[in-house]
C-alpha cells in the first residue's frame, strides 16, 4: 500500500513539473526566416502578393506587426499586400514574445501594369487606298510581355500576326479592328479603310516652300514632295506665262540671270483630276553682294538661333517648359551660350544658327561644331550651309549640304522624310512612318526620362515631318544581350562623330566632354552633287542623320554644344 501511495505522489509531481514547464515563458526571441533567398518581392498595381515567413520560438502569445514608415498595416503572421501606386515599399516585420522582439525588413517593388497599348499612325483618320494597291500596317505595341494579336475586317478574323496586309481587291468601305491581349490587359483600335477606284482617290502633293530666293546665275530645283496617286500624271511648267516643260517629270530646274520676281506655275493633270500650284522666284543680285565682312567686334560663336525643331527624343521637353518656336530658339541659344548640349532628337531634328558676319571659304576647315562623341558613341549630324542671297538677314534662301564620307553611296538616302505622330497618351512611344514605307517608334525610356511626352511641346499639330539626308546606321549590340551598345563612327564630315580625321585631335574624349568636328565650306554641293563653289556662308543647319535606336540607350540623337567660325580660332 505504501508503495502505491509513493508511486502516485511521484506521478503527480511529474505532471505538475510538465504543467509548470508548459506555462513558463519562452526564454529566447522569435526567429524570422524568409522562404525566398532575397528580401525583395515584385508585384504590379492592384495585384495581391502574400508573404508568409517561417517563424521559430513562437507560441500563442506571440504578436506580429507589419509596418510601413512606422504605420501598422497588418498584425498577423502572414501579410497579403497590394498597392494602387507604383513604387518601392519598405516593410518592417516584427515578432514579439516573452523572450524579446525580432525584426526583419523586406522590400516590395510595385510596377505599372504592362498593358499592350496600341499606336497606329493616322488610324483616327482612316485609310483611303487605290483598288489593287498594297496596304500593309505594322502597329506599335508598347509591352514587354508576351502578347497575342488579332485582326478583323467587318467582324471576321483575318490574321493573328502583328503585321497585316489588308485586302484591297473589292471596292467598298471596311471596318478594321486590331486587338492585343496579355496577362496585364487588353487594347484595341478600330478604323475605316476605303478601297477606291482611280476616280475616287485623292491626289496629294506638297511644296515645301512657295517662294524661293536665289542669286542671279544660279540654278535651283523645284520639286513637289509626298506625291500620292498621281497615276498617269503629266506635269506642265510655265515661267512668266511661257511653257518651258511638259511630261512625266515632276521636277523643274530653274535658272535665270534676270534679276527680279518671276512666276512659276506647275499643273498636274491625269485622267481624273487637274491640280495647280503657283510659285514665286526672287532672282537676287549676284553672290557676294550681301557678304558681311568680319570686324574687330565679330564673335567666333554663332549669335542667333533661328529655328530649333528636334525630332521626338528622350531629352525633349525635359527640365524646361517651351510652347512656341520663339521660346524653343531662346532655350537653345541659352544652352549653347553655356556650352551645354542641345539635343536634336531622332532623325531629321535640326537647329539653324547665324553669325554676326559671313564665314569665308579659304579652302581649309572653316567651321567647328561641338558635340560630345567618343569612341563607341557617335550620333552623326548632317551639316548644311546657306548664303544670305537676298540680304534680308534670314535663312530663307538655298541650303547646300556639306558632303561627308558617306555622300553619294547607294546606302545614303537623299530627300529622306520621317513623319512623327503624337502618342495617344502620356508616357508612350512616339510612332513614326517614312517615305520608304517603313514605320517604327521613338521608345519611351521611363527608367531615365519621365516627362509625359518626347514629342516637342511647341509642335501643335498631331503629326509633323522632318526631312534630310539619311546615313545607313552603324550601331550594334556588342554584348549580344542588349546590355552594351556601340554607336560606331563615320570617317569624316559629320557633327557629333568620333572621326579620326576632322576632330583634329588624338584625345579620346573618354569623359564625353564637349569636342569639335571641323568642316570645309569647299565641301558644299548642289542638289545634283556638283560643287557649289560658295565663297562664304551666313547660316548653318545641323540635322540628325541616322534613324535608329540602341536598346536601352534610346534613339541616336545628335547633340550640339556650339557652332563656331573656325577661321577666327585657327
What are these regions, as identified by a protein language model?
Residues 57-65, 143-150, 228-236:
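Solvent-exposed loop segments of extracellular immunoglobulin-like
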Residues 389-398, 420:
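Acidic, glycine-anchored loop motifs typical of Ca2+
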Residues 65-82, 150-167, 238-254:
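Surface-exposed, flexible coil segments in extracellular/virion-facing regions
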Residues 46-57, 131-141, 216-227:
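A short beta-strand segment in extracellular, disulfide-stabilized domains
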Residues 204, 278-379, 403-570:
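A domain-level signal for the mature, folded cores of soluble proteins
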Residues 1-45, 98-119, 183-192, 196-197:
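Bacterial Sec-dependent N-terminal signal peptides
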Amino acid at each position: 500500500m505504501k508503495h502505491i501511495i509513493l508511486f502516485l505522489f511521484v506521478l503527480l509531481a511529474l505532471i505538475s513539473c510538465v504543467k509548470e514547464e508548459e506555462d513558463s515563458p519562452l526564454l529566447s526571441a522569435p526567429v524570422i526566416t524568409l522562404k525566398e533567398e532575397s528580401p525583395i518581392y515584385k508585384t504590379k498595381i492592384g495585384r495581391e502578393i502574400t508573404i508568409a515567413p517561417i517563424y521559430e520560438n513562437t507560441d500563442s502569445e506571440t504578436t506580429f506587426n507589419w509596418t510601413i514608415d512606422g504605420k501598422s498595416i497588418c498584425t498577423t503572421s502572414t501579410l497579403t499586400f497590394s498597392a494602387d501606386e507604383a513604387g518601392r515599399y519598405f516593410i518592417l516585420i516584427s515578432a514579439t514574445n516573452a523572450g524579446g522582439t525580432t525584426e526583419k525588413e523586406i522590400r516590395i517593388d510595385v510596377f505599372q501594369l504592362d498593358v499592350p497599348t496600341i499606336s497606329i499612325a493616322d488610324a483616327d483618320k482612316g485609310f483611303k487606298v487605290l483598288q489593287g494597291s498594297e496596304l500593309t500596317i505594322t502597329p506599335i505595341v508598347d509591352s514587354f510581355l508576351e502578347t497575342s494579336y488579332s485582326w478583323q475586317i467587318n467582324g471576321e478574323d483575318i490574321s493573328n500576326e502583328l503585321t497585316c496586309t489588308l485586302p484591297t481587291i473589292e471596292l467598298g468601305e471596311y471596318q478594321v479592328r486590331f486587338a492585343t491581349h496579355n496577362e496585364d490587359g487588353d487594347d484595341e483600335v478600330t478604323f475605316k479603310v476605303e478601297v477606291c477606284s482611280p476616280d475616287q482617290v485623292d491626289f496629294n502633293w506638297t511644296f515645301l516652300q512657295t517662294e524661293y530666293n536665289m542669286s542671279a546665275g544660279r540654278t535651283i530645283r523645284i520639286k513637289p514632295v509626298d506625291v500620292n496617286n498621281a497615276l498617269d500624271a503629266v506635269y506642265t511648267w510655265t515661267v512668266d506665262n511661257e511653257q518651258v516643260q511638259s511630261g512625266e517629270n515632276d521636277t523643274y530646274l530653274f535658272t535665270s540671270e534676270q534679276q527680279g520676281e518671276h512666276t512659276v506655275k506647275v499643273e498636274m493633270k491625269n485622267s481624273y483630276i487637274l491640280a495647280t500650284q503657283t510659285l514665286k522666284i526672287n532672282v537676287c543680285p549676284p553672290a557676294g553682294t550681301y557678304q558681311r565682312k568680319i570686324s574687330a567686334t565679330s564673335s567666333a560663336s554663332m549669335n542667333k538661333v533661328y529655328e530649333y525643331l528636334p525630332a521626338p527624343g528622350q531629352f525633349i521637353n525635359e527640365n524646361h517648359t517651351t510652347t512656341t518656336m520663339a521660346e524653343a530658339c531662346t532655350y537653345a541659344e541659352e544652352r549653347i551660350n553655356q556650352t551645354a548640349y542641345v539635343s536634336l532628337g531622332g532623325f531629321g531634328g535640326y537647329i539653324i544658327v547665324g553669325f554676326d558676319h559671313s564665314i569665308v571659304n579659304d579652302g581649309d576647315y572653316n567651321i567647328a561644331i561641338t558635340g560630345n562623341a567618343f569612341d563607341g558613341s557617335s550620333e552623326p549630324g548632317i551639316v548644311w550651309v546657306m548664303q544670305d542671297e537676298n540680304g534680308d538677314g534670314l535663312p530663307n534662301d538655298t541650303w547646300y549640304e556639306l558632303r561627308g564620307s558617306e555622300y553619294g553611296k547607294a546606302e545614303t538616302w537623299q530627300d529622306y522624310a520621317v513623319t512623327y505622330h503624337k502618342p495617344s497618351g502620356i508616357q508612350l512611344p512616339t510612332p513614326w512612318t517614312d517615305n520608304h514605307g517603313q514605320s517604327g517608334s521613338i521608345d519611351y525610356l521611363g527608367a531615365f526620362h519621365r516627362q509625359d511626352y518626347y514629342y516637342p511641346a511647341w509642335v501643335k499639330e498631331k503629326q509633323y515631318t522632318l526631312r534630310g539626308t539619311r546615313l545607313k546606321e552603324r550601331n550594334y549590340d556588342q554584348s549580344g544581350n542588349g546590355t552594351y551598345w556601340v554607336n560606331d563612327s563615320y570617317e569624316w564630315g559629320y557633327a557629333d562623330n568620333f572621326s579620326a580625321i576632322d576632330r583634329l585631335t588624338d584625345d579620346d574624349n573618354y569623359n564625353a566632354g564637349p569636342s569639335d568636328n571641323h568642316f570645309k565650306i569647299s565641301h558644299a554641293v548642289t542638289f545634283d552633287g556638283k560643287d557649289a563653289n560658295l565663297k562664304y556662308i551666313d547660316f548653318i543647319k545641323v540635322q540628325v542623320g541616322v534613324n535608329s535606336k540602341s536598346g536601352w540607350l534610346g534613339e541616336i540623337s545628335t547633340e550640339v554644344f556650339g557652332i563656331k567660325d573656325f577661321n577666327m580660332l585657327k
